[in-house]
Amino acid sequence: MQVEAHLQKIIEKDGKVHLTLIDPASQTPDRAAEIALAAVEGGTDAIMIGGSTGASGTLLDETVIKIKENIHVPTILFPGSSAGLSKYADAVFFMSLLNSRDLGYVITNQVLGAPLVYRSQIEPISMAYLIVEPGGTVGWVGDAKLIPRKKPEIAAVYALAGKYLGMHYTYLEAGSGADSPVNPEMIGAVKQVLGENKLIVGGGIRNAETAKICTSAGADMIVTGTVVEEVKDVTAKVAEIVSAIKR
């Protein structure tokens, strides 16, 4: 089954999807595989692999290979640029950073990466990527014109544009390790215009309560990344969040 169809089946069954993000630059491939396995044991539905800096080349390939040896759930690339692609993954979030000032993140990296995706037959999942204040490292690297936290209507029209351009997913990103996640008002406004299209929310989600607030507001999928790198018991932390968001 294709990865996008697989995630849709999970939403139909459980109501929501949990994704764990692993940055290859943050640890060795072996450690990344350990984290991925622990997250899967906690109930995560797929492993996202990537980051805004340093996730490319041999390190990326070795990380994907090691993770796939350990787990049975899909691996999805989350590339910071065209260099963040690996033929060993199951799928890629083929995304455009719609609120970037730099055309490289809007379309040029996508043009450069498309031939590799085509040749390797990685499944592309089209996605509008939107960075919200505070934005963190990804906002700086991506030269994003950050969407103000208190302006949900701006996020909504960006998301609507992405939907009309044919993108299946929209990702609201507060930035890795953000002090607080995207607020519920913005999540709700975006989900309202997306309808059946899927909404992912990430950044600043460290516990079950926060994850539940995001899904109750309209998020279809939750991403946790920094927290799994920081806690000692990854399985317990992921299980806590998963149990809060799924029915």
UniProtKB/Swiss-Prot annotation:
Could you tell me one molecular function GO term of this UniProt entry? magnesium ion binding
- Pfam families named among the record's database cross-references: PcrB (PF01884)
Residues annotated to bind sn-glycerol 1-phosphate = 171-177, 203-204, 225-226
Needed cofactors: Mg(2+)
So where does Mg(2+) get bound? 23, 52
Which InterPro entries does the entry mention? GGGP/HepGP_synthase_sf, GGGP_HepGP_synthase, GGGP_synth, IGPS_HisA/HisF
The GO cellular component terms are: cytoplasm
Specify whether Lipid biosynthesis is a keyword of the entry.
yes
**Which pathway does it serve?**
Membrane lipid metabolism; glycerophospholipid metabolism
* UniProt GO BP: glycerophospholipid biosynthetic process
Q: Which reaction(s) does the protein catalyse, per the Swiss-Prot or TrEMBL entry?
A: sn-glycerol 1-phosphate + (2E,6E,10E)-geranylgeranyl diphosphate = sn-3-O-(geranylgeranyl)glycerol 1-phosphate + diphosphate
List its EC numbers.
2.5.1.41
Top enzyme class, one word, equals: transferase
Lineage, top-rank taxon, reads: Archaea
Q: Which UniProt keywords apply?
A: Cytoplasm, Lipid biosynthesis, Lipid metabolism, Magnesium, Metal-binding, Phospholipid biosynthesis, Phospholipid metabolism, Transferase
**Subcellular locations according to the entry:** Cytoplasm
Functionally, this protein is described as follows: Prenyltransferase that catalyzes the transfer of the geranylgeranyl moiety of geranylgeranyl diphosphate (GGPP) to the C3 hydroxyl of sn-glycerol-1-phosphate (G1P). This reaction is the first ether-bond-formation step in the biosynthesis of archaeal membrane lipids.
Q: What family is it from?
A: Belongs to the GGGP/HepGP synthase family. Group II subfamily.
Protein name as annotated = Geranylgeranylglyceryl phosphate synthase
Q: Which organism is it from?
A: Methanosarcina mazei (strain ATCC BAA-159 / DSM 3647 / Goe1 / Go1 / JCM 11833 / OCM 88)
Q: What is the lineage of its organism?
A: Archaea, Methanobacteriati, Methanobacteriota, Stenosarchaea group, Methanomicrobia
